[in-house]
Amino acid sequence: MDLQLQIPSYPIIFSFFIFIFMLIKIWKKQTQTSIFPPGPFKFPIVGNIPQLATGGTLPHHRLRDLAKIYGPIMTIQLGQVKSVVISSPETAKEVLKTQDIQFADRPLLLAGEMVLYNRKDILYGTYGDQWRQMRKICTLELLSAKRIQSFKSVREKEVESFIKTLRSKSGIPVNLTNAVFELTNTIMMITTIGQKCKNQEAVMSVIDRVSEAAAGFSVADVFPSLKFLHYLSGEKTKLQKLHKETDQILEEIISEHKANAKVGAQADNLLDVLLDLQKNGNLQVPLTNDNIKAATLEMFGAGSDTSSKTTDWAMAQMMRKPTTMKKAQEEVRRVFGENGKVEESRIQELKYLKLVVKETLRLHPAVALIPRECREKTKIDGFDIYPKTKILVNPWAIGRDPKVWNEPESFNPERFQDSPIDYKGTNFELIPFGAGKRICPGMTLGITNLELFLANLLYHFDWKFPDGITSENLDMTEAIGGAIKRKLDLELISIPYTSS
């Protein structure tokens, strides 16, 4: 058969040009009539990526600096993705509360699609019936106050073991960052599946890598339609490998859990609850194996970032300010006296420790940027926001805004004395966990762990720096993973305290 060049007919060509003409006309009309938030000059193709990459500055720092120039609501172009950055309590409230439904979605991330079972999870899932059901299960079944309280004995046992290990290493430098990270992950393993995982190090590594992959600044996430770049950058291959590794671990855990389950036994861990709901829950939307895998993976990490990284920051800040450390220690030791241990049921009495936690979360929020996505055309402060626009709320910038906070760079827990401001999503000056429908579901669990860890570290030990480190030269540089973490691990020397 001869190959012949197929030339489109004139009507088709004419229709094509009419179509292009109308698209241009619509685009011009939209740009002429729309009022977009101000923003920096955009380079062709890459947009504002060069400005964010300047000098190796972390994204949330650079966005804060740009917001000082362009205002609390600012447009930036990240490759193909139009984004609006929110940097004040007032505009954050508009997005996270007043227009919560309009901004209830998460931006599409390649990591969420590939690693988290096509967004079958809670944190990155698409807003809709399935997400609402998973969120309800999480709130009422998995992370309710009653459920968290039911795992009190797990926390107490693991913390006791943790303290014994630290005592055995007293007088020598200990990597407190790693020690607390291992503690939080052990607690979450037992809470989620009822036992320590035989390949716990592999699971911890997976959790860390999934968190980093979901940061949202990869080539694939800023050029979502250029599929060839996903491969050329190596990101898609890396995520495929990560998903395969993750799925293999989760499949093994769930299969083993099902095999060992006793008929009629009461659910005593979070995976039991999920499997029971899948079998007997009479749910509006069926709970799939992928839902359970995604939720299990998130439960492993739920509260871990808050607990471990915020403990790290709190200890570092108190080591830099000995008067705060002394005041917090005196309170803990006064409340628990000669008991010899910290009782979780009495932690509510530690009023000053709670101020320390608030101040730590102000300076070091659980997440650097809160991503949302616009679902329908709306306005913020008179500016037009279109569907699919990515919204980035910057809680780090809000927490350090001199218009909101006096001496914002200073660590001063006393600023919260007699203050009604809290971190639970109703005071938009302090939103380390977000707010609204997508507020972090692991907040209560994370805070429970955090307060317990800090109380024990302060009660059982005095602390000093290794040789060469002082409160003046302690490196407080940030790095980005799933949460804002210290660039360098915190190493301290523990000195056992005896109540007598």
Swiss-Prot record:
<dbReference type="InterPro" id="IPR017972">
    <property type="entry name" value="Cyt_P450_CS"/>
</dbReference>
<keyword id="KW-0408">Iron</keyword>
<keyword id="KW-0472">Membrane</keyword>
<comment type="function">
    <text>Involved in the biosynthesis of macrocyclic lathyrane type diterpenoids (also called Euphorbia factors) natural products, including the cyclization route from casbene to jolkinol C, a precursor for ingenol mebutate that is used to treat actinic keratosis, a precancerous skin condition. Catalyzes the hydroxylation of (-)-casbene and 8-hydroxycasbene to produce 4-hydroxycasbene and 4,8-dihydroxycasbene, respectively.</text>
</comment>
<feature type="binding site" description="axial binding residue">
    <location>
        <position position="440"/>
    </location>
    <ligand>
        <name>heme</name>
    </ligand>
</feature>
<keyword id="KW-0560">Oxidoreductase</keyword>
<dbReference type="Pfam" id="PF00067">
    <property type="entry name" value="p450"/>
</dbReference>
<dbReference type="InterPro" id="IPR002401">
    <property type="entry name" value="Cyt_P450_E_grp-I"/>
</dbReference>
<comment type="similarity">
    <text>Belongs to the cytochrome P450 family.</text>
</comment>
<keyword id="KW-0479">Metal-binding</keyword>
<keyword id="KW-0812">Transmembrane</keyword>
<keyword id="KW-1133">Transmembrane helix</keyword>
<keyword id="KW-0735">Signal-anchor</keyword>
<comment type="pathway">
    <text>Secondary metabolite biosynthesis; terpenoid biosynthesis.</text>
</comment>
<feature type="transmembrane region" description="Helical; Signal-anchor for type II membrane protein">
    <location>
        <begin position="7"/>
        <end position="27"/>
    </location>
</feature>
<dbReference type="GO" id="GO:0016020">
    <property type="term" value="C:membrane"/>
</dbReference>
<dbReference type="GO" id="GO:0016114">
    <property type="term" value="P:terpenoid biosynthetic process"/>
</dbReference>
<keyword id="KW-0503">Monooxygenase</keyword>
<keyword id="KW-0349">Heme</keyword>
<dbReference type="InterPro" id="IPR001128">
    <property type="entry name" value="Cyt_P450"/>
</dbReference>
<dbReference type="GO" id="GO:0016705">
    <property type="term" value="F:oxidoreductase activity, acting on paired donors, with incorporation or reduction of molecular oxygen"/>
</dbReference>
<dbReference type="GO" id="GO:0005506">
    <property type="term" value="F:iron ion binding"/>
</dbReference>
<dbReference type="GO" id="GO:0004497">
    <property type="term" value="F:monooxygenase activity"/>
</dbReference>
<dbReference type="InterPro" id="IPR052306">
    <property type="entry name" value="CYP450_71D"/>
</dbReference>
<dbReference type="GO" id="GO:0020037">
    <property type="term" value="F:heme binding"/>
</dbReference>
<protein>
    <recommendedName>
        <fullName>Cytochrome P450 726A27</fullName>
        <ecNumber>1.14.14.-</ecNumber>
    </recommendedName>
</protein>
<dbReference type="InterPro" id="IPR036396">
    <property type="entry name" value="Cyt_P450_sf"/>
</dbReference>
